[in-house]
Amino acid sequence: MLNRIRRCFSTLPLTLVMWQVITPLTLATPPRNPDKTVECELLVVGGGLAGTGAAYEGLLAGKTVCLTEITDWVGGQLSSQGTSALDERPTQRTQLIYPRGYLELRERLKDYYGELNPGDCWVSESCFIPEDGHKILKGMLEDAARKGRGQLNWFPSTVIKDLSIEKNPNGGTGKQIMSAIAIQHSPKDGAAPLNTYPLSQTIEDAYTYEDSELFNKTIIKFVPKPHDKAEPADWYVIEATETGEIIALADVPYRLGIDPRSYLEPSSSSTSGDPYCTQGFTYTFAMETTAEPQQHQLPDFYAQYAPYYSYELERLADFDLVYTYRRIWSPQKGEQKTFGGLSFTVPTPGDISMQNWTWGNDYRPGTAKDNLIYTREQLEQMGQLEPGKWMGGLRTETLRKGEEHSIGYFYWLVSGDTDSQLGDGVKTPDPYHVYMKGLDSPMGTVHGLSKYPYMREARRIIGRESFLYENGFMVNEIDISRRNYQDDFYKTNLSPATYRRLHAALAGLEGFKVLRGDASPEQITRRKRSTIYPDSLGIGHYAIDFHPCMTEYPAEKPGNTERKGERVGQGQAYPFQVPLRSMLPQNIDNLIVTGKSIAVSHIAAAAYRVHSFEWSSGAAAGTTAAFAIEEQLLPYQLVEEPIFRSKKLQELRQRLDANDNPTNFPNTSIFNDNWDDWR
């Protein structure tokens, strides 16, 4: 009913950029023939949690899986990005409603340490060393290959450079990725080992074919594994990168940054949208508590970033509180302490903390001068969309500044006495800590920063058009949010017609009364659940959590503020679903998108980004790819309307559920309209 209301009574703003056709992409000729050709049934690009989940399920299904990753660790946000503190919601965690692979990860962490929370942190029930996360996940993939009789081809330090996209004569409505060229780098003899230099100093080299002073390069061509007979698709490429590289390189329709305000995205901070304002990214680091005070050297660049740093809120203005928030190792429990209503154990020598703090090492650019993820227009102007010209799609200078910003934050923690948000007299130095660096440090880098920044937002595809979604499928703010949409903000900032449409969409069966004018928005009762999708293949639950971009350039400018209105949409969300339609891009039939690049809005993406969601979406992608190969169909055929009549879709969902990969939360039904007890 809600979908029909959308279709009949509204259209999305005309500011959306849509590409209706895709020009065939021919591989540019590398400087030499590929050094090796590798056959895959599933090419999973990106070794984060979504990619790991996809590979895990593909291997258990007996498939040949090629997994590429720009760093040399699997796990993404819980390993190479350093955020080794599982973001979970209480009810889902208590009932353990997670995909089987994620549950196995939690169990292996517990077995490895003898407890689930070796860091005794208070942000999560599980904080641990990032490198251990990588080791555990790598072991899980190897075991999955043995158990499912699949084949794992693991390609660390590898990036996709080019794609060949053509029409497949065996079927489908669009084109397909026929092959991919990748570059793998390894240290030259006599050169510094991997992870010596921060990402900003090596990323452009990683996307360059030629050997360099640091790296030898291996050119790899990925191709489909041959089948006995013609298939609708010979293989599947799964987009699981942290920024949506493949959707940019393949040039399928996508969005970036803030979406225009509409009745579907009523809390948007912009009426027209802004592709440059994405959520902040973070280079994490680890610091260890010492028994004696340490001497800390002032970074040359500290004065540039010092005006930014803050505890943010008075109730959080305590060093021990911030330190223990994401403490990842605590061999000896300290005394109990309470500050701002929060209780924790004080740090003791040998404790290790991972830092990830909004007004600390978050770097939050938001203008065309410094945005991290290049827009399509910027990529086109730079020539990165031309064959063989792809360089990763990120602004190297912004990566560099994010690295400096993070190192400066450590110095502020141990030596600083300023606070940009709370003023003088709040921050005092605490020199009993060292910055951990070295290949044997928790981050596994000589420089001490995470191998890759923690990314909260990426390019997000626009799903396929249909009768109900004429502008392309998208999960929007109102599909998951618990906000009170009768708040004065919405009455003031939405037109009367838009305000009425908003409440009609939230009203379920009563929506037509509102649209006809038979009832006012205030007279109807809004639904108290997220939107239910008949093609749901996964689940997630987290708050709509914002780390907004800053208003002015540069982000660290003294007196700079967060983008006005960006936090309006934040708050609690209902448990939500991962529909198959959110994973299928336009134009390309054998590309499945997972992780942070699925078709969700800017505000919804603030919830669709945590560890268990990434795994669930990855498990859905890997299972869908394996199912499509076995059933000799294309994934979009599973959701051709009417979806409710798709027997193959139901078979896919039944396979996921039978494999303990939930497609719904318990008691999900249009008749269960109250999820207020879920926290």
Q: Could you tell me what each predicted segment is?
A:
Residues 1-13:
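Bacterial N-terminal signal peptides that target proteins for export
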Residues 11-23:
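Bacterial N-terminal signal peptides
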Residues 32-33, 155-156, 160-236, 240-679:
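Flavin (FAD/FMN)-binding glycine-rich loop and adjacent Rossmann-like elements that form
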Residues 34-48:
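Beta1/beta-strand and adjacent pyrophosphate-binding region of the FAD-binding site
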Residues 43, 88-93, 119-128, 233, ...:
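Second-shell loop/turn segments in exported
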Residues 51:
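N-terminal Rossmann-fold NAD(P) dinucleotide-binding loop
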